[in-house]
Regions:
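Domain-level signature for soluble enzymes in the chorismate/prephenate branch of the shikimate pathway
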Residues: 1-185
């Protein structure tokens, strides 16, 4: 019996450090991890070089066969968005008119034919991330000042809840377009 290892594409940047850590350290998730910039992540997913990907939210409507699959995202809520909205990121800038709404900058998407067991294992890996955020910093490029890095992560809200889902659908329906940067920093 041949085991098919899912391929997971993730943007390699500060805000995804905990997710990457969770994927790398969850014993029940056997997956190939593709680290790249936002445009390459979208391309890998579009070309089926990735089964699951952390996709910039603005790109989701343009992807065929993509569905949001986990309870996690890279997002923010009104109380934490002040720091995020100071960024020069295109999606962050496009979100400014929606300033009172929570936002999801990136969501976990999978193709319709992705093995449900792989999605469940990813969900467990991301939950592991929630429980080991500080350890993720210690093993990252941001370990030089772990206290500051951990405090910076507090600006993000990683739970994809009903409010973010509704806000994201409102954003998509507004017709605003945002092209992800090639290098998120």
């Amino acid at each position: 019996m041949m085991v098919i290892v899912p391929r997971i594409a993730v943007v390699s940047c500060f805000s995804t450090t905990p997710f990457i850590y969770g994927i790398q350290h969850e014993d029940n998730l056997r997956a190939g991890l593709l680290l790249s910039d936002p445009a390459e992540t979208i391309q890998a997913f579009s070309e089926h070089k990735a089964d699951i990907a952390l996709i910039p939210a603005a790109a989701m409507p343009s992807l065929t066969d993509a569905r949001i699959v986990t309870e996690y995202c890279v997002g923010g809520v009104p109380a934490s968005k002040e720091a995020l909205l100071a960024s020069d990121d295109a999606l962050v800038g496009a979100w400014k008119p929606f300033g009172k709404l929570p936002c999801a900058f990136a969501v976990w998407a999978a193709h319709a034919d992705t093995d449900p067991d792989a999605v469940e294992a990813l969900q467990h890996a991301l939950t592991y991330r929630l429980e080991h955020g500080y350890e993720a910093i210690l093993e990252s490029a941001f370990a030089a000042d772990p206290g500051r890095a951990y405090a910076e992560l507090a600006h993000f809200d990683y739970i994809f809840d009903n409010q973010k889902d509704k806000a994201l659908k409102k954003f998509w329906n507004s017709g605003l377009k945002a092209v992800p940067r090639a290098n998120p920093g």
